[in-house]
Every structure is written in C-alpha cells, then in structure tokens.
C-alpha cells in the first residue's frame, strides 16, 4: 500500500479548498492519477511548496512537488499550532496499493508515528513569545493590559498540573488493537490489558459482593384490614380492655355495661369537661372504624325512648336499634352525645355554639364525682392506724355530714361553680370572715343535734372557728414597739421589729412565719444572754488575749561581750557543758538515711508531723510553694480549757492566744532550720547557733524529752561560771524527777527550782509551745518546725511567766497537760484507761500477782477501786492476800493510799457476810461516800487515770442515790438481769486466774519434791532409797491430788 502525506500551507485564517489533483508516475509504470480529496488548510501569508513522497518497499522514494511544505516543517515554523489541529489538518493521498504486501503497510504506519512524534517534540519545546513562564497578562481597571508575575500558589498549581499531565500514559491514535479472541477458554489479551491498567479502588470504597436478602413487604388489602380490626375488637370486648385507634385522628375506646349488655364507649370532648360544637372529630377512616365497632357494641335489641339517659355519653350503637328521634349521622353507627327537646344528637355532627350549651349531655356527673372522691381518698388517707377499719356508721349520715363539712370549709352554692371559687379567693360575699363565722356556728349546732355520733367533726369545726377568731387587736402596743425599734439597726432591735410585725397578724400567720418568729426570739435571747455574760466577771465571751507583735528584748543576746563580730551568740564554756544534754537526751540525725523516719513525732494518744523533710528545698518555685502548705488538724474552739484564772480574773500569760474577735489563733507551718536553737513565742522568732559539739551533726530530742529544749534555752542566760553546775543539776536531779512526758506543772516547778539557784534564767525566752487540746499535749517546737497546723498557741514567753502555773490557787486545765503524756497512758492508751471494764480486768490479773499489782498502782493508785463493780472481785482481792500485801507496803510509802485500802478491806468483810449478789451490791453502794472521802485525801497527779477514776466514782454515786431513796421509802429495787450476767463473767475470769495459780503451784511442788528425792538418793545408802522413793510418791499423791 502506498501512502502520500502532505501538509497544507499555514495561514492566519482557516479556509476550505479542493485538494490538488495530478498524476504520479512510478519508474517505468504508467502514470496514475491522484485521488481527489477535500483538504482543510490554514491560510497564511507565507506560501510554501508542497512535497509528496511516495515509496514502495525498497524502491527509491518519489517526490512530488506542490504548493505546500511538509507537515513537520510547517509545524516547526508555526509553534502556536496545536498538535491535535495539525493532525486533523493532515491529508493523506491514497494510490492504488497492492493488498498483499504487509511490509509496505508497516512502513506506512512507522512514518505516521515518526511524523506524530516530531510534531509532539516541537510543541513541547516551544514557549510563549515575550511572556515568561511565571508571568501572566491582566487587564487593569483603565482597560490597559499589564504583565504581572504569577503568585507562588498559582505556580505551584501549574507545576502540579504539568506533573500530572507528564505522568499520563501516551495513547496513540494508530496503536495496534489487541485481539479480543480467547485462546483455550482463557481471558483474551484485551481483557488482561484492561485488568492491568485498571485503577484499584481503596478497600473502604470497594463494592460489597454480598448478596443482600430482600424481604417481601407484607401488604394487606382493605378486606384484610377490616378482618383484622374485627378480630381485635372481639378480643378487646371479651377482656374489657381499652382500644386506641390512631389514624389522622385519635379515638379512645373502652367497654361498659348498660342494660345488662356490654357497649363500646368513645371518649368524647364533653367527658373531658370541654364543651365544643363538634364533640368528636372524625374522618372517613375513623367513621369506617366506628361502623365496625358498632357491630360489636351491644346487641340487636332495640332501645326504646327514655332508656338512653345520663351515663350514655359516647356509647356507640347502630342506627337501626334506636327508636327515639335522632339527628343525622355521618355513618351507619350512632355515637350518643346528648338530648335536646327529645332528640338525640350524634357526637360527630357539628352544632351551633348556642345549641352546644342547650344540649343535655348524657355524662354521669355523680359517677365522676365519686370516682374522683374514691381515688383521692384512698390515695391520701394516712396509714398510721392502730386498728382495723370497719363500716359502723350509716352511709347516708356520712354523706350528709361530709356535705355540711364541705359547706363549712368551702361556702358555695354549687361545688362546680367558678364564681363561688372567685368569692372564696377574694374573701367576699359568702366567703367573708363574719359570714363564715356565722355559718360555722349554725352548721356546728346542726351536727351536734342531728348527728351526735360525729363528735370529731364538731371538734374540727371548733378549732377552725378559733383560728378565724384569733385576731390581735392590740394596735397601741404594736405602734409603740414599732416606734422604738424602727430604724435602729443595732443589736437585737431588727429582730424585735420583725417579731412585732408577725404577732400583729394574729390568725393569718403561717407556719413558716411562726418558725421565723421563733428564730427572731432566739436571737433576742442570745443577745440578752451575751449581755449578761459580758457583765459577769471572767466570761469567755469577753475573753481576748492578743499576742504582742513586738519581739521580747533579751539583754543577754544584746550584750556585745556575748556576741562575735557577726552578731552571733558565743556559747563559751556553756557550749562545752551542754554536752550533758545532747549526749543523754538527744539523738544524732544521719542525713544519708533521709529524714522520713523523723517526720512523725509520736506522742501518747496521737502524733505530730515535723517539717524536717522540708530541709530539702527544690529549685522549682511552684513546687516550693506547695511545700509551704501545712497539714491542718481538727480545729478546736475557745473553751474553759484554754484559759487560766486567778481569783476570777484571767491570767493572760497562762492562756491560749486569741484574735481581736475572740477566736483562737491557730498555728501555721513552722519551717525547719539546721544547727539552731529557736526561741521566742511573740513577734519574730530568734535563731541561735547551737554549740559546736561535733562538726555538722544534727540533733533531735528523744521521745518524751522535748522539754529539754526549755532547759537548753535557759542555759543561754546562765553565767559561764555556773554552766557546769546548772547542767549537772538538770541532768542528775530534775530530769530524773520529771522523766518522760511530765506535766506542764512539773516543768514549771523545775523552772522555779532553777530560778532559786540561778536568778538570771527568770527572763530567759522559751521555745515556741503549741497546745493540742484533743490529746491534752503541750508541743515544744524545736528548730525542725512543725508541718501539722491548727494547734492553739500558748502565750507564755519567758521562764517567769511559765512559773505562774505553779500557783496553788490558779484555776487552769493547761497546767495538767503533758509535755507529751504519762507512761501509763503511753503503755495502755487513754481509751483503755477510760474504760472501767478494762480496768477491772487489769485488777483481776493482779489479784493473784501482788507484785504486778503494786507496779500498776505506782502509776494508778486508784486501780483497786474498780473492784466495786463486782462483789466477787472484792472477796477474791481480800481472800488472796493481795490486799493485805498492798496495805503493808503503802503504810510505809503513802498513808493516804493505805487508808483507802483499809476502807476496802472493811468493805470486803461486810460483803462476805451476805450470800446474795443484790445484798452485796447494796452494801457496796452504802459504802460509796466513805470511799469517795478516802479517795479525796490521796494526792495523785491530775492525769488521765485520775480523771477516769473520778468519772467512774461519780457514775456509781449517781446510780446509787436514787436507789437509797427508794429503799428508805420501803420500795423493793428490781435489778436488771445484766448484773448477774456481768458478775458471772467476772467470776469466770477470776476462776481462770485461780486455775493458773493452782497449776503453777502444783508444778512448783512437784519440782521441789523431785529435787529433794535426787538430793536424798545422792547422799544416803542404796537400801534406803527405795523406802524414801515410796514416801515421796505418797506425799506427791497427797499434795497434787485433784479435788
């Protein structure tokens, strides 16, 4: 096949002209005419010759000249021509081709592709003339074209488009088509190629291959719906259930019995209390449903005139069974509404507004009234009845009395009349005050005379009449109180004014106003009470104990001879002799092991947290501020325990500090320091360097010896020449007397003792002291501060002020507080000491162990008094010999305790003469005054054990005094069964103790006999051993035999 291609001349205008025709001669072959074709060319001002090239196989090409150039050349000369346009404008000249030569066809296709690629390469290389790639032409507002640079975003989008275009596959127009023939039943080449180039969908966009099951929609025709409706109506009628038909309108249906037949009743508007022109709104669907309903409402028996009456409203009947004159009906059924002039009206038809008021509706008003009455009566009647209710009063009389009560409480002409309700709201007409009082009197007399069995109704009316008559008419005093208290905002005058306004209202006062009046009266009473207390001497309400904000002046710390060049205190020889304190009563802190083990300061019945852990300071300010927060304890108000009085006046130096308003000053967090003695309780504290005993050693007082810090602070004011003697006196004499956790009174006495020998310590400043009223502890704060906050602050600042606690006539609870606690409290706990049952068990353990009991009595000399709870314990205490042992001991040690034990011994002898437990308890109760008098002479410390014993004896005395009066009057006292149970329990405990004593005794005897037998056999001849062994066995049998 021969192909001739050409390119038409390129012009600036598009024209159409007939293709050139001519003759083409190939070698010696005869010339052949060219096929005439119509060619569309682009006209241009430049005329170029056309060349036609024809080649067959390997023969030389034949060039045919014409008036146009080649297509490639024309394309290169005109860069603005699009590839697609040049391709569309190319013309092909066909000549006669031999169809069997496939090689010629391949050359023809290759030339076409070569020309196409040349044109495409030229188009990609060309660029716009005069405008850069990153510029564009815009038109200004004045109509002038302007070249401006493209924005970075536009360039970015352009480059993206070019990248996408370059990535698209090149699809040639003359590409060979793939075969669609399938070989061997497999996929064809075109299908395989399409699958390879097909874009894969994302997984979430891949269509599901699951075959969905399409359910058939159940449809029912009108006949089926009617059949279903009839079946449902039958079922509901049988069960007397309610039906609600919901279409365009809602219809509610229930079933009632009339004339011994069950009818369907529709809820119409007038049954809900609404009077409308159309009593029931329905459409075609609703009317069709009502027609179906009418076939199952009632039966086919005709209903004669007069039968339809009140209570038939909304009932559905068929038109054929009504013989009375009736209105039209929108369907075959008839819904009864009411009657007017003997004519029945259907509820579905519309009547005039006038007629809607004239119609006598057939609603059962009385039935509705009793229905509402029964519902509310049953719902709101009280359940706190102590009897079973039955019908004992006449029902007619009950209804009459209920009507009279209704008229008395709610005077009206008709209970459904809204005008009567308005009169009652406005208190006018028949509901006015005088009218109601007159009516109440009449109705009360009627009930008294005609219904004598209803006395409760008369009482209710009497109370009601009294409430209406309770009017306050004392306007003169009301006006005077108003003139005195009005405008005065001081003290209780506003409460007086409000109370006066409430009292003048009389019977119209509400319960809430009565409650407010009581509150106002309470404020007035409080004002009078406070005013009376303020007048009294030594009242807590007037107690104010503000701390001085000025620091106490200590001359010792201001003397230049006592300070170094940095202003620090010089201990001198005092520092050397202070070793006696640090070596005996302080322990060394090892910072390498951390401060956690020292953070909690254990005291009896509680603990206090030190701030020693805050010595590690973080560099983060936020964390540092968090560290400056303390841990508050339970707050305690100002009570009698916070103050000290002398002849009725407050001793402020021996009291807790308060604010100006009288509230207690609560301690704040005390931050720690190293190697310092902190003194000063008022103003800013003073920090004194500790003596250099060992370099970089940190000391903390041992548990129970925190009061040593007081003596260390006193050492600052002691002369250096007296320091050795001072420290020896404290160590050898005072600390031995005080021991662990002494009372504040004992510490103050020790300070007075030191003041006698060393007067300079009188003005020595004390460390900070905090008061814990809950555990009755005085905390002496050292340089490690206190993380626990919320304690009261003791105002005592100097040794001289602390000595004031030693005054014998000082009334103070603080002087009995422990600077820690007692050993007895520490060992057993205050909760056990306060429990009489625990104390008597402790006494039972010592009944057969007199030495242990003697040790317990050293801490608590009143322990034997708990034997008064049980006659059996007293007898065992006497019979065991422990009482006699203690008497012999205390005759030499404390005669007052010996007298108390003698009284107990005489009581035990009296108890032993009686056989019954009740008689023995009466003997114990009669001896209580004598025991209390003997106890009062015992001089014991005012600690928890003493206070617990005082409460115990007071309890016994208060229980016994009423019994004495009854016995003196000749009455028999019936004891509770619990006394015998308690006695049996205590006797069991005594028996166990006795069994343990017997077992120990038996073991001791046996060991003694075995040792005697061994000793005899070692010293005597063999022939005498057997005889002696038999004697030992007989003695052992006699001694160890069980009874």
From Swiss-Prot:
GO terms for molecular function: cysteine-type endopeptidase activity; serine-type peptidase activity. The record marks 362-363, 820-821 as: Cleavage. A motif (Involved in interaction with stylet and aphid transmission) lies at residues 414-417. Potyviral RNA is expressed as two polyproteins which undergo post-translational proteolytic processing. Genome polyprotein is processed by NIa-pro, P1 and HC-pro proteinases resulting in the production of at least ten individual proteins. P3N-PIPO is cleaved by P1 and HC-pro proteinases resulting in the production of three individual proteins. The P1 proteinase and the HC-pro cleave only their respective C-termini autocatalytically. Residues 698-820 form the Peptidase C6 domain. GO terms for biological process: proteolysis; symbiont-mediated suppression of host innate immune response; transport of virus in host, cell to cell; viral translational frameshifting. The keyword Oxidoreductase does not apply. GO terms for cellular component: host cell plasmodesma. Keywords: Host cell junction, Host-virus interaction, Hydrolase, Inhibition of host innate immune response by virus, Protease, Serine protease, Suppressor of RNA silencing, Transport, Viral immunoevasion, Viral movement protein. PROSITE patterns: HC_PRO_CPD, PV_P1_PRO. A motif (Involved in virions binding and aphid transmission) lies at residues 672-674. Residues 219-362 form the Peptidase S30 domain. It comes from the Viruses. Pfam families: Peptidase_C6, Peptidase_S30, Potyvirid-P3. This is P3N-PIPO polyprotein. It comes from Turnip mosaic virus (strain Japanese) (TuMV).
């Amino acid at each position: 096949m021969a192909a001739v291609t050409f390119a038409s001349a390129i012009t600036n205008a598009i024209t159409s002209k007939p293709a050139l025709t001519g003759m083409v001669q190939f070698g010696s072959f005869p010339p052949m005419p060219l096929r005439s074709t119509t060619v569309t060319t682009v006209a241009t001002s430049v005329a170029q010759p056309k060349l036609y090239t024809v080649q067959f196989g390997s023969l030389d090409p034949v060039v045919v000249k014409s008036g146009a150039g080649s297509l490639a050349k024309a394309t290169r000369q005109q860069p603005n021509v699009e590839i697609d346009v040049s391709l569309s404008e190319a013309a092909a000249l066909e000549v006669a081709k031999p169809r069997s030569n496939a090689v010629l066809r391949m050359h023809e296709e290759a030339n076409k592709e070569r020309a196409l690629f040349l044109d495409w390469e030229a188009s990609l290389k060309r660029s716009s003339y005069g405008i850069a790639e990153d510029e564009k032409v815009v038109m200004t507002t004045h109509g002038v074209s302007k070249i401006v640079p493209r924005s970075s975003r536009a360039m970015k989008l352009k480059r993206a488009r070019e990248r996408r275009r370059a990535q698209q596959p090149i699809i040639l127009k003359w590409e060979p088509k793939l075969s669609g023939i399938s070989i061997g039943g497999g996929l064809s080449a075109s299908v395989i190629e399409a699958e390879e180039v097909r874009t894969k969908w994302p997984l979430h966009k891949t269509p599901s291959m699951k075959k969905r099951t399409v359910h058939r929609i159940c449809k029912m025709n009108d006949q089926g719906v009617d059949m279903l409706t009839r079946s449902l109506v039958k079922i509901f009628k049988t069960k007397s259930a309610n039906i609600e038909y919901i279409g365009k309108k809602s219809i509610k249906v229930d079933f009632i019995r009339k004339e011994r037949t069950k009818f369907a009743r529709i809820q119409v508007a007038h049954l809900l209390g609404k009077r409308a022109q159309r009593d029931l709104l329905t459409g075609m669907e609703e009317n069709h449903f009502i027609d179906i309903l009418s076939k199952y409402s009632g039966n086919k028996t005709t209903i004669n005139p007069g039968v339809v009456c009140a209570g038939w409203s909304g009932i559905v009947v068929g038109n054929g069974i009504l013989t009375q004159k009736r209105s039209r009906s929108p369907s075959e059924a008839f819904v009864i509404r009411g009657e007017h002039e003997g004519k029945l009206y259907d509820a579905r038809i519309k009547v005039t507004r006038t007629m809607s008021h004239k119609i006598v509706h057939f609603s059962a008003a009385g039935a509705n009234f009793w229905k509402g009455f029964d519902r509310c009566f049953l719902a709101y009647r009280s359940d706190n009845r102590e009897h079973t209710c039955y019908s004992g009063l006449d029902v007619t009389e009950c209804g009459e009395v209920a009507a009279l009560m209704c008229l008395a409480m709610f005077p009206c002409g008709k209970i459904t009349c809204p005008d009567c309700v308005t009169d009652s709201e406005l208190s006018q007409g028949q509901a006015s005050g005088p009218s109601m009082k007159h009516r109440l009197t009449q109705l009360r007399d009627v009930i008294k005379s005609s219904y004598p069995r209803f006395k409760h109704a008369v009482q209710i009316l009497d109370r009601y009449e009294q409430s209406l008559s309770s009017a306050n008419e004392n306007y003169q005093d009301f006006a005077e109180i108003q003139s005195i208290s009005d405008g005065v905002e001081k003290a209780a005058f506003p409460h007086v004014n409000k109370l006066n306004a409430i009292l003048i209202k009389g019977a119209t006062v509400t319960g809430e106003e009565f409650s407010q009046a009581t509150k106002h009266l309470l404020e007035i009473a409080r004002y009078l009470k406070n005013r009376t207390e303020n007048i009294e001497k030594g009242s807590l309400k007037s107690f104010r104990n503000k701390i001085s904000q000025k620091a106490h002046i200590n001359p010792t710390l201001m003397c230049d001879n006592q300070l170094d060049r940095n202003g620090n205190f010089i201990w001198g020889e005092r520092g050397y002799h202070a070793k006696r304190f640090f070596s005996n009563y302080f322990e060394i802190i090892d910072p390498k092991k951390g401060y956690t083990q020292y953070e909690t300061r254990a005291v009896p019945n509680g603990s206090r947290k030190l701030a020693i852990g805050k010595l590690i300071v973080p560099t983060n300010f936020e964390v540092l501020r968090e560290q400056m927060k303390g841990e508050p304890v339970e707050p305690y108000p100002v009570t009698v325990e916070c103050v000290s009085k002398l002849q009725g006046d407050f001793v402020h130096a021996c009291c807790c500090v308060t604010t100006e308003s009288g509230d207690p000053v609560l301690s704040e967090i005390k931050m720690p320091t190293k190697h310092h003695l902190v003194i000063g309780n008022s103003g800013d504290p003073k920090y004194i360097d500790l003596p250099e005993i060992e370099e970089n050693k940190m000391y903390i007082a041992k548990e129970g010896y925190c009061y040593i810090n007081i003596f260390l602070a006193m050492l600052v004011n002691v002369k250096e020449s007296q320091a050795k003697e001072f420290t020896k006196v404290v160590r050898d004499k005072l600390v031995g007397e005080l021991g662990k956790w002494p009372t504040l009174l004992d510490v103050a006495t020790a300070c007075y003792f030191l003041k006698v020998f060393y007067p300079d310590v009188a003005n020595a400043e004390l460390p900070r002291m905090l008061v814990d009223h809950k555990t009755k502890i005085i905390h002496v704060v050292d340089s490690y501060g206190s993380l626990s906050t919320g304690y009261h602050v003791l105002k005592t600042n100097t040794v001289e002020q602390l000595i004031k606690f030693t005054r014998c006539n000082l009334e103070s609870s603080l002087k009995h507080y422990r600077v820690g606690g007692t050993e007895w409290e520490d060992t057993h706990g205050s909760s056990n000491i306060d429990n009489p049952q625990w104390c008597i068990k402790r006494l039972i353990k010592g009944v057969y162990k007199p030495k242990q009991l003697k040790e317990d009595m050293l801490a608590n000399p009143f322990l034997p008094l708990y034997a008064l709870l049980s006659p059996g314990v007293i007898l065992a205490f006497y019979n065991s010999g422990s009482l006699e042992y203690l008497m012999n001991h205390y005759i030499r040690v404390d005669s007052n305790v010996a007298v108390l034990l003698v009284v107990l011994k005489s009581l035990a002898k009296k108890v032993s003469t009686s056989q019954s437990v009740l008689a023995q308890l009466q003997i114990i109760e009669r001896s209580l005054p004598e025991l209390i008098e003997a106890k009062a002479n015992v001089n014991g410390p005012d600690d928890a054990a003493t206070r617990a014993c005082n409460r115990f004896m007071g309890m016994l005395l208060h229980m016994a005094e009423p019994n004495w009066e009854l016995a003196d009057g000749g009455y028999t006292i019936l004891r509770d069964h619990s006394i015998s149970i308690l006695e049996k329990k205590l006797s069991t405990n005594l028996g166990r103790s006795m069994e343990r004593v017997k077992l120990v005794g038996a073991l001791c005897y046996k060991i003694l006999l075995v040792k005697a037998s061994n000793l005899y056999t070692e010293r005597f001849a063999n022939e005498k051993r057997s005889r002696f062994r038999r004697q030992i066995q007989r003695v052992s049998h006699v001694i160890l035999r069980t009874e």
